[in-house]
């Protein structure tokens, strides 16, 4: 049951250049975001329109990081992506969140 003091839980997906993996994982750990899963990918997009829209290159080897934490910690980390990792610039990465209302197992 969610109380007024409890925080929302969100899942963040982070896609970036593979060479940034260690720096991103260190930053996540420093931000106390510990529940993460790392996967490798290749390229961001296949169509010219989406490539142009997001400024991504097809030939980049990527790292995909999935994290689950509180919305407060994730929002602070998203700000850190802008200031330290320049995610507001083209060809750096994409990060987005999805709220998690409940988890069943």
Residue ranges and their predicted role:
Residues 1-105:
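Positively charged, small/polar-rich N-terminal and surface patches that mediate targeting and assembly
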């Amino acid at each position: 049951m969610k109380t007024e003091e409890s925080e929302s839980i969100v899942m963040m997906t982070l896609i970036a250049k593979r060479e940034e993996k260690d720096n991103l994982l260190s930053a996540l750990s420093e931000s106390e975001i510990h529940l993460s899963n790392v996967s490798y990918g290749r390229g961001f997009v296949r169509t010219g329109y989406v490539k142009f829209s997001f400024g991504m290159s097809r030939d980049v080897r990527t790292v995909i990081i999935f994290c689950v934490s509180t919305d407060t910690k994730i929002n602070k980390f998203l700000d850190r992506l802008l200031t330290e990792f320049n995610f507001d610039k083209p060809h750096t990465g994409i990060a987005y969140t999805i709220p998690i209302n409940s988890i069943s197992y």
